[in-house]
Amino acid sequence: SDLVHLRIFVGAASEVQFMDLKKFYINGQFVDPVSCELFDIINPATEESIGKVALGSPGDVDKAVFAARNAFAKTSRLSKQDRLEILKTIRENYKKRYDDIAAAVRTEMGAPVKLAEGGQTATGLGHLKTAIHVLEGHEFEYNHGDYIIREEPIGVCGLITPWNWPINQIVSKMAPAFAAGCTVVL
């Protein structure tokens, strides 16, 4: 089922070494990029390389969008309860990996401990909590005078995030997209 697939993703993502990101997660599995171009991740505080990340190409984007479009056919039909379960599972895994996420933010951004843990990592967790709270109280279909308004997922969301607020911006964009029933390409 779709929930099983998403649980597999969340579990697989928890096994990723943060600074050795040479594969992309596309269509339920980690895959090699179309091109082999790698980019050094530099800690701005030390100016040292802390790992490498694969650079995506138009071919990688096409593969990811194609997979996300195919997944959208099913995820767009997930119930509100299923979407809540997905967000809660992500939140629980986020909590379990909190220290790892904070360490990754610290080294990737060269951020002080308080900023990485409190400003970045905690804020990401707060975005998940807010998305869950909003979704719990949201109705996707309601009467408006003589009309029925039905809110439906729009499709694949392309998420672009800055280097200086990485986890915060990922979560603040991903959580509402998942709550709405959309798929994402990050």
Region annotations inferred by a language model:
Residues 1-18:
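N-terminal amphipathic/basic-hydrophobic helices that include classical n-h-c signal peptides
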Residues 3, 27, 160-162:
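Intrinsically disordered regions, especially transient/low-confidence alpha-helical propensity segments
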Residues 6-7, 58, 62, 147, ...:
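Hydrophobic residues within membrane-embedded alpha helices
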Residues 13-145:
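N-terminal Rossmann-like NAD(P)+-binding subdomain of aldehyde/semialdehyde dehydrogenases
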Residues 138-186:
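Conserved small-residue-rich beta-alpha loop and adjacent elements
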